Amino acid sequence: LANTNQVVLPKYLHLDPAYPNPFNPTTNISYNVNIQQELEISVFNLNGQKIRILTNDYHYPGRYSIQFSEQNLPNGIYIIKLQGRKEVHTQKITFIK
């Protein structure tokens, strides 16, 4: 019988939940890199407009953490996008003044 409870883990990247979320004015974004690769972490509004690039750099395997801090955003939901060579991860964050 096949085990239907198996969890498939990302091969190359893992994006942890941002915290705090909702945030004002700063949230922490942590992620794991399992192979050497160039990564971009960007923040988008719900219209799909890229409002910030948090990092666009070559990463070695390991655990990383960056902060997104913004006081001039309107209240609302934003999307964090972690894009590597072979995987893309997204996550919603909420900014509340």
Show which residues each predicted segment covers.
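C-terminal tail/sorting-segment detector
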Residues: I53, Q67, Q71-K97
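Solvent-exposed serine/threonine-rich low-complexity stretches and specific carbohydrate-binding patches
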Residues: I51-H59
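Glycine-centered coil/turn sites that cap beta-strands in beta-rich domains
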Residues: A2-Y19, F23-N45, I53, S65-E70, ...
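A detector of long soluble domains/segments in diverse envelope-associated and cytosolic proteins
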Residues: L1-A2, T94
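Extracellular Ig-like/FN3 beta-sandwich strand-entry sites
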Residues: Q36, P61-R63, L73-I77
